[in-house]
UniProtKB/Swiss-Prot annotation:
Superkingdom of origin organism: Eukaryota
Record's keyword terms, sorted: Cytoplasm, Initiation factor, Protein biosynthesis
GO terms, molecular function: guanyl-nucleotide exchange factor activity; translation initiation factor activity
Complex formation: Component of the translation initiation factor 2B (eIF2B) complex which is a heterodecamer of two sets of five different subunits: alpha, beta, gamma, delta and epsilon. Subunits alpha, beta and delta comprise a regulatory subcomplex and subunits epsilon and gamma comprise a catalytic subcomplex. Within the complex, the hexameric regulatory complex resides at the center, with the two heterodimeric catalytic subcomplexes bound on opposite sides.
InterPro entries, per the entry: eIF2B_gamma, NTP_transferase_dom, Nucleotide-diphossugar_trans, Trimer_LpxA-like_sf
Function: Acts as a component of the translation initiation factor 2B (eIF2B) complex, which catalyzes the exchange of GDP for GTP on the eukaryotic initiation factor 2 (eIF2) complex gamma subunit. Its guanine nucleotide exchange factor activity is repressed when bound to eIF2 complex phosphorylated on the alpha subunit, thereby limiting the amount of methionyl-initiator methionine tRNA available to the ribosome and consequently global translation is repressed.
Protein source organism: Caenorhabditis elegans
GO CC annotations on file: cytoplasm; cytosol; eukaryotic translation initiation factor 2B complex; guanyl-nucleotide exchange factor complex
SUPFAM superfamilies with a match to the protein in the record: Nucleotide-diphospho-sugar transferases (SSF53448), Trimeric LpxA-like enzymes (SSF51161)
One biological process term in Gene Ontology: cytoplasmic translational initiation
Name by which UniProt lists this protein: Translation initiation factor eIF2B subunit gamma
Subcellular location per the Swiss-Prot or TrEMBL entry: Cytoplasm, Cytosol
Any Pfam family: LbH_EIF2B
């Protein structure tokens, strides 16, 4: 596909997940042990796009290059990747696109580094062509999400409000909850489109197909900083001007297109996609292999709907359900792991129980400890028989844990 460029945004800091992004940039956060950005890169490559620009902070460029090479994605999907280094001053996505507009020379498929899906984006691109759209935003009502560990909150609701012309899918309004603080004014759109559905059913996946000519106009706009909060609403409003040729659409991701889709920009969605994407993992990231398999009769280890890396050591009589265990972990005998993410180099003692938790790099959990619905930050220690529940465990908090 030579008429479009892929734009992959990897410069964001991950402010909604500070306990995880304090030690690693969001684009490098591991999802089933693989840096997050490789998933949207795979999506672009599977679409057939051969010209991809990756916007990244300069200090991370070499790391991203190494991870791309290691992934062998370019061996399967040949493409040219250009890394564009951005500065701290490029605060919003629109700022970034404006400041580097000379690098964008075609219609573009813009994808955030936290878009994780096994779905094909080819139907979206086909829709973009067929409708001669100015902008097409990918939306989905099946984005995986869950309450974040470390809290007692209920399952989060969708956070985007949008108005869609039911007959065509044309977008008449789009706003995220962070920006939804003003009265909703839709007089112009209702005059043109009398049948509009206002809904919060869908998530904006932060995947946009957009015409090059409007990106050129963006480069001349001094007062636009955010792509979604500023530029997309501007384009939507311009549809209603006399003689306007601008058309903005929402493309609903069909349920039959893929098994898993996530906009993993929160702790809850990040946590859940680590578990959900495992069913498609070996197809998306072939270079990682199949991981460890166990025969309960001979190994005395029960592992269900889980991925365990080859370098992990699991002792007998352990039970692992819908979890991920990363490289160089040591799991003691008679441990129970359920609905949890175990990062690199974690040591878990005999008889410990971990449920619905994220255990970060280098954590040590003592024998017979019980960790439920928690995030245990990098290099923390939970003592033997320690019990911690609904907590974010960081530096200086170990003295508060109970020893039952």
């Amino acid at each position: 596909m030579h008429e479009m460029q892929g734009i992959l945004l990897c410069s964001g800091g991950g402010t909604r997940m500070p306990v995880l992004t304090r030690h690693v940039q969001k684009c490098l956060l591991p999802v089933v042990g693989v840096p997050m950005f490789l998933y949207p890169l795979s999506s672009l490559l599977r679409t057939g796009i051969t010209d991809i620009k990756i916007f990244v902070r300069e200090v991370l460029q070499l790391t991203l290059e190494k991870e791309v090479k290691k992934s062998k994605l370019l061996e399967k999907y040949p493409a040219h990747i250009e890394y564009i280094c951005v500065n701290q001053e490029d605060f919003g996505t629109a700022d970034l696109l404006k400041n580097h507009h000379s690098k964008i020379t075609k219609d573009a498929l813009i994808v955030s580094c936290d878009f994780i899906s096994d779905a094909s984006l080819i139907p979206l691109v086909d829709f973009f062509r067929a409708t001669n759209s100015t902008l097409v935003a990918l939306i989905a009502d099946t984005c995986v999400n869950a309450p974040a560990p470390g809290s007692k909150s209920k399952k989060p609701k969708a956070t985007d409000v949008m108005a869609i012309v039911e007959s065509t899918g044309q977008l008449a309004f789009l706003c995220g909850d962070d920006d939804f603080d003003a009265p909703l004014v839709m007089e112009k759109s209702l005059k043109i489109f009398p049948s509009i559905k206002l809904t919060s059913k869908y998530n904006d996946c932060h995947v946009y197909a957009i015409r090059h000519k409007v990106l050129l106009n963006l480069s001349k706009s001094k007062h636009i900083s955010s792509f979604k909060a500023d530029f997309v609403p501007l384009l939507i409003d311009k549809q209603f001007e006399p003689d306007s040729d601008i058309k903005c659409f929402a493309y609903r991701l069909p349920h039959e297109n893929g098994f898993v889709t996530a906009h993993a920009n929160t702790l809850g969605s990040y946590f859940e996609v680590n578990k959900a994407i495992q069913k498609s993992f070996t197809r998306l990231m072939e270079y990682r292999g199949n991981g460890k398999n166990f025969n309960y009769k001979t190994d005395k280890i029960a592992a269900h709907e889980s991925r365990i890396e080859e370098s992990a050591e699991i002792d007998k009589d352990s039970v692992i359900k819908r979890s991920f265990i990363s490289d160089n972990c040591r799991i003691g005998e008679k441990t129970k792991l359920k609905e949890s993410i175990i990062a690199k180099g974690v040591v878990i003692g005999n008889g410990a129980s971990i449920s619905n938790s994220i255990i970060c790099d280098g954590v040590e959990i003592g024998e017979n400890a019980d960790v439920t619905n928690c995030i245990v930050a990098k290099d923390q220690k939970v003592p033997a028989k320690g019990k911690v529940q609904n907590e974010v465990v960081e530096d200086g908090e170990d003295e508060e844990w109970t020893d039952d």
